[in-house]
Amino acid sequence: MAKVHFNLDSKKYIMEFLPDNQVKIIQTGNEDRVITVQYFSDTKVTDFMKCIKSWDFSKLKDKTLYTLN
C-alpha cells in the first residue's frame, strides 16, 4: 500500500492508497482527521489537491466516504 506525505497550505497530510480505487486522506496535527475518498481510475493527483484545499477537515466527519469525479 503506497503512502504519500505532503504539505499543503501549511498543513500536513498523508494519502494512503487502498484497494478498489480508494484513498485514505489524513490531515495530521494536534488531532488527526481521516476521510476515505473513492476515485475514478483517471483521477489525477492535481484533482486531489484541488479538493483537499477546498475541504474544511474540521467540519468533515472522520471516515466519511466521498467520491471524486
Description of each model-found segment:
Residues M1-N69:
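Polybasic (Lys/Arg-rich)
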